[in-house]
Amino acid sequence: MFNRNWTVPALLLATIIVPSLLPIRVAAQTGRSSPVAPRREVVAAVIQEAYDKFKDDKNGKNADYIPYLAQVDSKLFGIAIVTTDNQVLTKGDVNYSFSIQSISKVYTLALAMDALGPDKVFEKIGSEPTGRPFNSPVAVVDMPSHTGNPFVNAGAIATTSLIAGKDVDDKWNTILEFYSRVAGEKLTLIDEVYKSEAATNTGNKALSMLLAKYDRIYADPFESVDIYTKQCSVGVNAIQLARMGATLANNGINPATGEQVIKAEAIPHILSTMTEAGLYDGSGGWAWRVGLPAKSGVGGGIVAIVPGKGAIAVFAPPLDEAGNSVKAQKVIEYVANKLNYNLYSPASVGWK
């Protein structure tokens, strides 16, 4: 669908200006033709426009049901694009490490699919929108699958329970090491976030027991919740998150390391699930307005995938009522519309 072999000169470096007036460089190309190079200056300009347009937006509020998240500076705001040939364009607070939260669900799903195959995971977890809040116990009772999909909490806990290991620590290390390979660098647990969530995760424990009632959890319920809580507490910055997204855009190959981290056969299933359920109750409106697979987290991050081209990640803590970053949604919508990234638009095919 996408032709990645445009014959254009390899442009090596560019700069964009941040509020401190210090230049941030666009990473050097790897020598291949770039899906962003033909319009590199345009992309950088659009990022600048989006940053300026939405930086003072005061809508939304930080998640407050997790004490740590309520204390994060609500003014933090960073934008990063990573292309499938590892060009990096950034603006704002892109080096701040925030908790990945529900975006982790994407990559635990990928890990489970790599181990068991997409069809087996679909059989055990399902992939249907619930039409209810992401932490709803009612969906566990009402949905025929009882798990809904991998991106609501019940389905995510069940997905985490599929990860093999000799004990809890082994399973957790498998997940964290996999996330690091997708990010192209070592990721770590934000211990304060983990402790804050572990002290308030009674609802997720209740979900795990409901799953056990319906035989839809595949390891010890409370141990699975603990691992799930840890995966949500992993720290990422906007650049790392964009690279994790670009790995999906690049058919499972990390554009920084060249490693095939995720099996190519899993990518369409992951992206389709992101499209239908990636932004909680806002997923339908997102598909209507933006037309990109994406996943949000209550830590304030959203990553959106442009298959064959790259990914855009935005971090801004204030959330809407559905639990999605207000600024991140607006930025990605703006960039996608300006650059014709909408997958359902004919203009998104190739560069014109």
Task: Walk through the language-model features, giving the residues of each.
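Bacterial N-terminal signal peptides that target proteins for export
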Residues: 1-11
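Bacterial N-terminal signal peptides
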Residues: 10-23
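Boundary at the C-terminal end of the N-terminal hydrophobic targeting segment
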Residues: 26-28
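Structured C-terminal helix/loop/strand segments within mature extracytoplasmic catalytic/sensor domains
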Residues: 31-36, 47, 250-352
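Active-site-adjacent helix/loop patches that line small-molecule binding or acyl-intermediate pockets
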Residues: 33-53, 57-59, 112-231, 247
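A short, well-structured edge-of-sheet supersecondary motif
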Residues: 55-91, 301-304
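Short Gly/Pro-enriched turn/cap motifs at secondary-structure boundaries
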Residues: 69-72, 147-149, 199, 291-295, ...
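Active-site SXXK
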Residues: 85-86, 98-122, 244, 312
